[in-house]
Regions:
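An N-terminally biased module of ancient metal coordination in phosphate/nucleic-acid-related enzymes
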Residues: 1-71, 154
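Active-site neighborhood of phospho(di)ester-bond hydrolases with catalytic His/Asp-centered motifs
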Residues: 2-4, 38-40, 76-80, 136-138, ...
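Non-catalytic positions within long, well-ordered alpha-helices that form the structural scaffold/packing
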Residues: 30, 129, 157, 186-187
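Active-site environment of divalent metal-dependent phosphoester hydrolases
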Residues: 44-47, 82-84, 142-146, 170-173, ...
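Extended substrate/RNA-proximal surfaces in nucleic-acid metabolism proteins
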Residues: 49-164
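Short loop-to-alpha-helix "cap/lid" segments that border enzyme active sites
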Residues: 175-184
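Short acidic/histidine-rich active-site segments
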Residues: 190-206
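Mid-to-C-terminal alpha-helical segments outside catalytic/metal-binding sites
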Residues: 208-209, 213-242
């Protein structure tokens, strides 16, 4: 399986606190059947001011430490980027780490605030599209505005966005509403990816296998294979080829 959303780089956001926790997270992922993992630390202007250059250095260090620890996982780096008007300057300067490219279009893991869908979100996503950037919206099922007004899902889809569900939402870890939205989106064929959004060993570990079983029961083995393997593999091919 491919996990395209995780916070496994140590000490740079609200994910792994240190190298020991990073390695523990990688071991959990490996034991769960994950073969490829993309570190997607937050880029949230004013809170987590991570840069593409620094992240590339950080992933190189983690790759070496994982190798030294005998962990056999393919690792790559991108970012989970918070929607903010100030991102425009970073886009124009070529400073955003994309999570992949398909058919010459760059893909960006674009996070909405957890509490709401910001005003002007549609204009910003349209602007990204004009820059040859397609947004993947992570964990839409956990956004409070979307929970209250599911029509946002339809609007985001109309804008060309793809969706990535959190594996633990499908299991019910984020509440009944997030689970119900996840199931509804899966049944309607609105989901392109499922990922762990791993942050910590105890509370938010990188586990996908149980969610994959649930998705298989819900929409079939072939569709589950697309969400957990085929789609993320195709998306991130350029990251793992580097």
């Amino acid at each position: 399986m491919f996990d395209i959303h995780s916070h496994i780089l140590p000490g740079i956001d609200d994910g792994a606190k240190d190298l020991n926790e990073s390695l523990a997270l990688l071991k959990i992922a490996q034991d769960d059947g994950i073969t490829h993992m993309v570190a997607t630390p937050h880029i949230h202007i004013g809170r987590f001011n991570n840069s593409a250059k620094a992240l590339n250095n950080d992933i190189d260090v983690l790759k070496q430490e994982a190798f030294n620890a005998g962990i056999d996982l393919k690792l790559a780096v991108a970012a989970e980027v918070r929607l903010d008007i100030e991102l425009m300057a970073m886009v124009m300067a070529g400073q955003l780490p994309f999570i992949g490219a398909l058919d010459s279009v760059n893909y960006l893991l674009l996070e909405l605030p957890h509490s709401h869908v910001p005003q002007g979100y549609d204009k910003f996503i349209n602007w990204l599209s004009k820059q040859n950037i397609k947004a993947i919206i992570p964990h839409p099922e956990r956004n409070r505005d979307i929970q209250a007004n599911p029509f946002y899902i339809e609007r985001l889809k109309q804008l060309g966005c793809d969706f990535q569900l959190t594996a633990s939402s499908i299991e019910g870890a984020w509440g009944d509403t997030a689970k119900a939205i996840s199931i509804d989106m899966l049944q309607k064929g609105l989901v392109s990816y499922v990922a762990s959004d791993a942050h910590s060993v105890k509370r938010r570990p990188p586990l996908l296998s149980n969610a994959k079983r649930l998705v298989t029961d819900l929409i079939g083995e072939l569709e589950a294979q697309h969400l957990f393997v085929n789609n993320p593999q195709r998306l991130t091919e350029s990251l793992f080829d580097e």
